[in-house]
A protein has these predicted regions:
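Catalytic alpha/beta core domains of metabolic enzymes, predominantly
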Residues: 1-65
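A C-terminal functional module that forms or caps the active site or interfaces directly
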Residues: 44-96
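C-terminal extensions of enzymes
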Residues: 80-136
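Extended, charge-enriched "interface" segments that sit outside catalytic cores
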Residues: 136-214, 466, 474, 488, ...
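C-terminal amphipathic alpha-helical interaction region
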Residues: 137-140, 521, 526, 543-547, ...
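Glycine-rich phosphate-binding loops that contact phosphosugars or nucleotide phosphates
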Residues: 208-384, 458, 462-467, 473-481, ...
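Active-site phosphate/pyrophosphate-binding segments
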Residues: 304-460, 465-470, 503-617, 621
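Extended C-terminal subregions enriched in glycine
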Residues: 468, 591-623, 627-630, 640, ...
C-alpha cells in the first residue's frame, strides 16, 4: 500500500510544469529503487516483492534466487498503479487503529541507516585488513600540531630528555626519573607483552574451556583497572565476535559489572542466563569492596539456580598471588585462578592477565593481539630520539601542555574505538592527579566550534583510517586551523588498538616524570574508601546511614552541601536558584564534573550528556561526566588530589528496590549511598566547590527536571 502511494507521488512530481521545464533542458528523472526484496517469510509468495513492485522508471534489486523464481512463475503487470485508491483508503485508516505511519517509517529509516552503516564499515574494515596483510605490520603513526608556544616547550623538553638518557632510564627502571620513592617496584608492565607472548597455550586453553562450557555470556565483576580494559575490548570487538561474523563461530558475550547501584546490578542480572554464564572476579588486591560484593551476590544467585555443587565451576578469579581472593577461590572450588603480576599496578594491567584472560574468553586471538602490541613496544624502546619514540613523544606533549596550563586533555575518537577513552581517562587522570597537579581527561564530550574552547585544552584525535567519521575530521581540522594544539594518532583499523594500550602507558609514565610526580601511586583514592567504611560501619550499628538535612526540597528533588559550600551559596527558593549560584562560581580554566550515582544506561547517559553540554556551552569550560562509583577508581584521584579547579555536581537517587548481599549486613543500595556520601565528604574536606542533588526513584523524570532547572539557571550565564 505504501509503495503504491509513494509511486503515485513520484509520478505526480515528474508531471509538474517545473519538472517539464527541467526535462526540456536535458534533465533525467531519478528512478525509484526497491531494495532487499527477497521474501523472508515462508508463508508469503517467493516473488511477492517483485510482483507487487513493478512500475515504469523503477529499479528492483533482487537476490539471485528471487530472480530465478520470478523467471519461473512471476506475474508481469504494472502493479504499482493498480488499486491506488484502495491504498489511499487503507493508509488513511491506519491512525484510527493506533498505527502511526510516521513512527513506523522513522523507525525503519533509523534501523536502515544503522544496517547500511555497519555494512559499509564492514566493507572498509575488510579492505583495511587486506591492505594490512599486503603491506605488513607498521607502528601507528602520529602527528603533532601544537602551535608555536607549545611546540617550543616540547622541543626543549625532548632535548633535556635525550640529554638525560630519559628513555634508557625508564627501561632501566631508574626511580630517579620520577621522585625516587619506589617507582621501580611498579614497572613490570614494561616487559609484560614479551612475557605473555611466551605462554600462548595459556590463552588457547582459556578459550577452549569457555567453548567447552557452552557459555552464552562471560560476566566480569571488577572495578577500575581490573575492568576498564575488558570493557574496551567488549565494546570494540564484542558484537562481531558474539555474532560469529565473517563465517567464524560465535563466542560468549563479555559483559562488565562495575557499579554498586542496585538498578545496575539488577539490569545486568536480567540480561544473562545464570545457567549459561561464566563469572570472572577480577581484583588485584583481592579485597576491593565492590568485586567482593558482586562475587558474594552472584555466588548466592547461582547456588540458588543450579545448586551449591555447581557454583565453583561457574567462577574464575583473576588476582595477585597470595591475595584474599585467591584463598577464597581455592577454598570454594573456583574453576580457575589466574594470577596477575604484583609489579604491575591496576591501571597499567591491560596487557596482563587482567586484560588478556577476558580477551581470550570473548574470542579475541590473544597471540595476534599481543603481536600487534609488540610493534609499539619495540618502537618505544631506547634507541630513537625522544620525538621519534611514539610513547615518549606523546608523554612529553601531555606533560608540557599540563605545565603551561593546557591541562584539559580532550579525547576525540572515531566511534568504533570511542570506548578506549574511558581506559585512557583512568590511566592518565589517576596517574597525574596528585600534589595539586593533574591532567584532567575530558572524554565523551562532543566536539564544538573552535571559538567555544579556552586556552586550557589539548586535543588528541584517535582516528580509525578504515572507518573515519567525516564530521570529526572536519571539526578537528577546524581546531588545528584555529591554532588549538592537536595530536593525531592514525590507527589503520581495529586491529591496531593494542598498540595504543602500550603507547599510552609509556606516555603516562613520561608525563609523570615531566610533571615531577610518581605516576604509579594513588594517595587520595584511599580517603574515599575510609569515608565509605565509616558510613557502612555506622549503618551496621544503627541500621541507617548518618542523618542529613537538605538545604532545599521541592517536587521530590533535594539539595545538599557541606557547611562551607552552603555558606558560599547563600539561600535560594528554587532548584534553578541553587544551580545558578553554584555554577556562578565557575572561573576561566576550571572544569565541571557531573558525578552521577545512577544506573549507567543509554537513556540516563543521553540526558546527562545534554546537561553536560548545556553547562559547557553556557560557561565555555571543559566538562566531565562520570557514573559512580565507577569514577572513584578512575578520575576520583584527580578530583581530590589535583588542583582546586573542579566544580562538582553530584547526583544521587532513591533506589526503587535494594538487593541483599549474602554474608553482608547491608545491600548494594547502602554501599552505593555510602560511597557517594563518603566521596562527597572528602571533596568537601579538600575545599572543593560542590553541590549534591538527590532525586527520586524515577530517574528519567528527575534528570529531565534537573535539565530544565539547569536551562533556567544558565539562561543568563
Amino acid at each position: 500500500m505504501c509503495s503504491s502511494h509513494l509511486y503515485a507521488v513520484y509520478e505526480r512530481t515528474y508531471a509538474t510544469g517545473r519538472w517539464r521545464a527541467l526535462a526540456s533542458k536535458g534533465a533525467r528523472p531519478q528512478r525509484l529503487l526497491w531494495a532487499s526484496t527477497g521474501t523472508k517469510n515462508p508463508a508469503y509468495s517467493d516473488t511477492l516483492y517483485v510482483d507487487e513492485l513493478i512500475g515504469r522508471d523503477t529499479v528492483n534489486t533482487v537476490p539471485p534466487q528471487t530472480l530465478d523464481a520470478f523467471r519461473d512463475h512471476g506475474r508481469v503487470s504494472h502493479t504499482l498503479v493498480e488499486d491506488v485508491e484502495l491504498a489511499y483508503d487503507i493508509l488513511s485508516r491506519l491512525e484510527q487503529v493506533g498505527i502511526s505511519l510516521d513512527e513506523v517509517t522513522d523507525g525503519l529509516l533509523a534501523d536502515g541507516l544503522v544496517l547500511f552503516e555497519e555494512a559499509m564499515d564492514g566493507l572498509l574494515a575488510t579492505i583495511a585488513s587486506l591492505q594490512r596483510r599486503a603491506r605488513g605490520p607498521r607502528v601507528t603513526p602520529s602527528s603533532l600540531h601544537l602551535g608555536d608556544a607549545l611546540e617550543a616547550r616540547v622541543t626543549a623538553a625532548a632535548a633535556r630528555w635525550d640529554q638525560a638518557s630519559g628513555t634508557q632510564r625508564l627501561w632501566d627502571r631508574d626511580a630517579t626519573l620520577w621522585t625516587d620513592s619506589g617507582e621501580e617496584r611498579w614497572l613490570g608492565w614494561l616487559d609484560i607483552v614479551q612475557a605473555q607472548r611466551g605462554q600462548p597455550n595459556t590463552f588457547k586453553q582459556v578459550a577452549a574451556d569457555v567453548k567447552k562450557g557452552g557459555f552464552s555470556d562471560v560476566l566480569l565483576l571488577g572495578m577500575g583497572g581490573s575492568s576498564l580494559c575488558p570493557d574496551v575490548l567488549a565494546r570494540t570487538y564484542g558484537k562481531a565476535l558474539s555474532a560469529g561474523k565473517s563465517g567464524k563461530s560465535k563466542w560468549p558475550r563479555l559483559r562488565i559489572l562495575d557499579s554498586t547501584v542496585p538498578a545496575q546490578v539488577a539490569a545486568t542480572e536480567a540480561a544473562i542466563d545464570l545457567g549459561k554464564t561464566l563469572f570472572v572476579v577480577a581484583s588485584k588486591s583481592g579485597s576491593t569492596l565492590e568485586p567482593n560484593a558482586f562475587m558474594h551476590y552472584f555466588l548466592g544467585r547461582v547456588g540458588r539456580a543450579l545448586g551449591d555443587a555447581e557454583v565453583g565451576s561457574r567462577f574464575v578469579a583473576i588476582t595477585d598471588p597470595g591475595s584474599a581472593l585467591e584463598r577464597f577461590a581455592s577454598e570454594h572450588g573456583f574453576h580457575k585462578i589466574h594470577h596477575g603480576v604484583p609489579e604491575i599496578g591496576g591501571r597499567f594491567s591491560a596487557l596482563s592477565h587482567f586484560g588478556m584472560v577476558p580477551a581470550a574468553m570473548m574470542g579475541i586471538d590473544v597471540a595476534s593481539f599481543l603481536e600487534e602490541a609488540e610493534h609499539m613496544v619495540q618502537a618505544c624502546r631506547p634507541g630513537a630520539a625522544a620525538l621519534e619514540n611514539p610513547g615518549v613523544a606523546l608523554g612529553l606533549v601531555l606533560g608540557e601542555a599540563a605545565l603551561c596550563g593546557r591541562d584539559k586533555l580532550t579525547l576525540v575518537a572515531t566511534p568504533g574505538i570511542a570506548s578506549v577513552g574511558a581506559w585512557i581517562e583512568q590511566l592518565v587522570a589517576e596517574s597525574t592527579g596528585k600534589q595539586g597537579k593533574a591532567i584532567v581527561v575530558v572524554d565523551g564530550e562532543p566536539l564544538s566550534r573552535p571559538e567555544d574552547y579556552g586556552d586550557d585544552r589539548l586535543f588528541v584525535y584517535l582516528r580509525l583510517r578504515s572507518t573515519p567519521d567525516a564530521a570529526q575530521d572536519l571539526a578537528v581540522e577546524a581546531l588545528e586551523q584555529a591554532g588549538h594544539p592537536v595530536v593525531r594518532l592514525e590507527l589503520d583499523d581495529l586491529d591496531a588498538l593494542p598498540q595504543e594500550l602500550f603507547r599510552w602507558e609509556i606516555a603516562t609514565a613520561v608525563a609523570g616524570s615531566v610533571m615531577g610526580l610518581n605516576p604509579f601511586d594513588q594517595p587520595d583514592v584511599e580517603a574515599s574508601k575510609i569515608a565509605t567504611r565509616a558510613m557502612t560501619s555506622a549503618y551496621e550499628q544503627t541500621r541507617s546511614l548518618p542523618s542529613e538535612d537538605p538545604l532545599f526540597t521541592s517536587e521530590g528533588i533535594s539539595v545538599f552541601a557541606d557547611g562551607a559550600n552552603a555558606e558560599a551559596l547563600g539561600r535560594h527558593t528554587s532548584l534553578s536558584g541553587w544551580l545558578r549560584a553554584h555554577f556562578a562560581r565557575v572561573q576561566a580554566g576550571d572544569y565541571v564534573a557531573i558525578l552521577a550515582y545512577v544506573d549507567m544506561n543509554e537513556e540516563h547517559e543521553r540526558l546527562l550528556q545534554g546537561s553536560r553540554l548545556r553547562i559547557r556551552d553556557a560557561k565555555s569550560i571543559a566538562t566531565c561526566l562520570g557514573f559512580g562509583p565507577r569514577f572513584l577508581h578512575s578520575t576520583g584521584q584527580a578530583y581530590k588530589g589535583g588542583p582546586n579547579s573542579g566544580v562538582f555536581l553530584q547526583i544521587t537517587a532513591e533506589h526503587a528496590t535494594d538487593l541483599d548481599i549474602p554474608d553482608h549486613r547491608f545491600g548494594f543500595g547502602v554501599i552505593a549511598d555510602a560511597q557517594a556520601r563518603g566521596d562527597l565528604s572528602v571533596l568537601a574536606e579538600r575545599g572543593r566547590r560542590l553541590l549534591r542533588v538527590h532525586v527520586g526513584s524515577d530517574v528519567v523524570a528527575a534528570l529531565e527536571a534537573l535539565d530544565r532547572a539547569l536551562a533556567d539557571a544558565l539562561a543568563d550565564a
